[in-house]
UniProtKB/Swiss-Prot annotation:
Recorded family membership: Belongs to the cytochrome f family.
PANTHER family with a match to the protein in the record: CYTOCHROME F, PTHR33288
Protein name as annotated: Cytochrome f
Keywords: Electron transport, Heme, Iron, Membrane, Metal-binding, Photosynthesis, Signal, Thylakoid, Transmembrane, Transmembrane helix, Transport
Species of origin: Prochlorococcus marinus (strain MIT 9215)
Cofactor binding: number and manner: Binds 1 heme group covalently.
Gene symbol of the encoding locus: petA
Length: 317
């Protein structure tokens, strides 16, 4: 009965996530492309064969991500994997409509096979408090070991706690005690490139040709059309969306690849690997027994030494 209930809850959560994704695509198509769940629709795995997490394909700027994972954990135990996504307080970025908006953050944690998001009934009160307002999603039904979060308001979520449940090799022979690797990614801010390959408005716009800027047209929505005349008298028009600020003016001479705008991006993506040891209880017991044995041996050696010293003293040596 409990298994059936968990299955129903899992399918309900997946349905809600899918529904939210579809609605966001319909009503906010350009905004949603910056969010972690877009990777779910385009990549079977969020990590490429090269080791790169696919979020870096859209979030081109690099910024640090920090992870805190315990060195070792017991079987069938709940532990915290903490992802820290640092950036300056009160930092604003350019939204899809060109206005300044607070940064949002997201994270992905790729756990080893067998590890997964801990069920809520096993969360401690501390974990419940630390994860309040955070919604965790499995990358897919088949990949319970890959968990994504976001977008979340960055000012209150620079540190995201992932409650993780370790496997129990004593009940499932597919898993073994030993050292395992985790792959972790953290992002702050919008991407620079959409999955379609088009630029967002959160990137530097450059000239595709050399020449002289003939004129700059300002469009009603605040975007620009920069008309560039080359040496042959041909006009090339570069479209700049609302958001980035122009750093050129009419009659400026430019070369292909020169920037037309500033760089509005203040965010970035970072990834790292971490390790955790799934500790066997028998190994712990053996280690304790070893230390006890070493301690007893040292005590016996000290006692033996004192005994020898007494004998030598009695014999006048």
């Amino acid at each position: 009965m409990k298994g059936l209930k968990n299955q129903i809850m899992k399918k309900t959560s997946l349905f809600i996530c899918t529904l939210l994704f579809i609605l966001s695509i319909v009503f906010y198509p350009k905004i949603t492309f910056a969010y972690p769940f877009w990777a779910q629709q385009n990549y079977e795995s969020p990590r490429e064969a090269t080791g790169k997490i696919v979020c870096a394909n859209c979030h081109l700027a690099q910024m640090p991500t920090i992870a805190e994972v315990p060195q070792s954990v017991g079987a069938d135990s709940v532990f915290k994997a903490v992802v820290k996504i640092p950036y300056k307080n009160d930092l604003k970025e350019i939204g899809a409509d060109g206005s300044e908006v607070p940064l949002q953050v997201g994270a992905v944690v790729m756990l080893p096979d067998g590890f997964k998001l801990a069920p809520q009934e096993r969360w401690t009160e501390e974990i419940k408090e630390e994860t309040e307002g955070v919604y965790f999603t499995n990358y897919s039904e088949e990949k319970e070991n890959i968990i994504i979060v976001g977008p979340l308001p960055g000012d209150t979520n620079k540190e995201i706690v992932f409650p993780v449940l370790s496997p129990d090799p004593s009940t499932n022979k597919e898993y073994h005690y030993g050292k395992y690797s985790l792959h972790i990614g953290g992002n702050r801010g919008r991407g620079q490139v959409y999955p379609t390959g088009d630029k967002s408005n959160n990137v530097v716009f450059t000239s595709s040709t050399s020449g002289t800027i003939d004129s700059i047209d300002i469009i009603e929505d605040g975007s620009y059309k920069v008309n560039i005349e080359n040496d042959n008298g041909e006009i090339t028009t570069e479209e700049v969306p609302v958001g980035p600020q122009l750093i050129v003016k009419a009659q400026d001479k430019i070369n292909a690849g020169d920037p037309l705008t500033n760089d509005p991006n203040v965010g970035g993506f970072g990834q790292l690997d971490a390790e955790v040891v799934l500790q066997s209880p028998y190994r712990v017991i053996g280690l304790i027994a070893f230390f006890i044995g070493v301690g007893l041996t040292q005590i016996l050696l000290v006692l033996k030494k004192k005994q020898v010293e007494k004998v030598q003293a009695a014999e006048g040596i």
